[in-house]
Amino acid sequence: MTQANLSETLFKPRFKHPETSTLVRRFNHGAQPPVQSALDGKTIPHWYRMINRLMWIWRGIDPREILDVQARIVMSDAERTDDDLYDTVIGYRGGNWIYEWATQAMVWQQKACAEEDPQLSGRHWLHAATLYNIAAYPHLKGDDLAEQAQALSNRAYEEAAQRLPGTMRQMEFTVPGGAPITGFLHMPKGDGPFPTVLMCGGLDAMQTDYYSLYERYFAPRGIAMLTIDMPSVGFSSKWKLTQDSSLLHQHVLKALPNVPWVDHTRVAAFGFRFGANVAVRLAYLESPRLKAVACLGPVVHTLLSDFKCQQQVPEMYLDVLASRLGMHDASDEALRVELNRYSLKVQGLLGRRCPTPMLSGYWKNDPFSPEEDSRLITSSSADGKLLEIPFNPVYRNFDKGLQEITDWIEKRLC
């Protein structure tokens, strides 16, 4: 079946699909202060989703393309769940968030199929994969249309990997007590085995969202990158996120001695946002298997335990947390109680001495990750490094921060 036909089969025009903003039924606290964050984007009036321009541009999407798709959503006069929120159009049709981003992805998919130059075709496939992932954002459990977009993103990513420089292998890892999980091992040119970074992504992203990190930062230094999806999404959707947040990544780490392309004696973990919760747990529980752990905007304590901090977070992000925990119908009080159990300080880890070198990068006044969380991480490590990343100019400083983090990782791996 061709990719185009697969798209047509998955996205049959039906209007009974649940609309994304209705999937998590929590008590709404009403108006919230505007939020802006380098890693998560910003709240914009009349949008349910946070608009994450920096990360979308960093992944290769043209800013004009973002505005074009947003304009199509805004101009739609189709029925909405909430007339005040543009991105709540009901059903897979014009104006629906998933429809418009998937339609944009199909344009690039068609370009990829028509392009004869393999590398350029690979770029177009990668572009399509990124757009399908934005269509599925924020990846809430039970969002049928989003799951179909994720399937198309994975397919496009596999097509891209066959054409782009280096080698990518799709790998299956066995996890006792449940379904196996699938990861992608990205390898630079040259002969392995390679020093490898195990990527621990955020809760509102997919493992295929981090190709730019590999291509721009790790590959030029001869470092491989291994990704897996976080529990409850993508290829890890059959696994619920629990307080043992690092369970899947631990089983992957333990399997690395049997992967011939990976130098299992030179492995680091890198955690974005809640992925840092996973990475820091690994630093404590699997220190003999890790040379270093780096974190960026870590969610390890304050957001999980401080009610005032939770009140500053947009509804969409709280919906993501509730969805990952399988608490779609829980009260806000029940969600707060459960989130507290995910704090690595409450679990008795952070604050104890950890032998693994740990770096943590942060932005001042980050609503998701205050400086204190990063200080807690680095002060707990026998070899800690704190990295403040200035906010403006946001893109340049984000790139500079990633270069510094990669330098730090490279020194400990190579």
Swiss-Prot record:
InterPro entries: AB_hydrolase_fold, FrsA, FrsA-like, FrsA_esterase. The keyword Hydrolase applies. It catalyses: a carboxylic ester + H2O = an alcohol + a carboxylate + H(+). Its EC number is 3.1.1.1. The keyword Magnesium does not apply. It comes from the Bacteria. Keywords: Hydrolase, Serine esterase. GO terms for molecular function: carboxylesterase activity. Pfam families: FrsA-like. Catalyzes the hydrolysis of esters. Belongs to the FrsA family. This is Esterase FrsA. It comes from Escherichia coli (strain 55989 / EAEC). The lineage of its organism: Bacteria, Pseudomonadati, Pseudomonadota, Gammaproteobacteria, Enterobacterales.
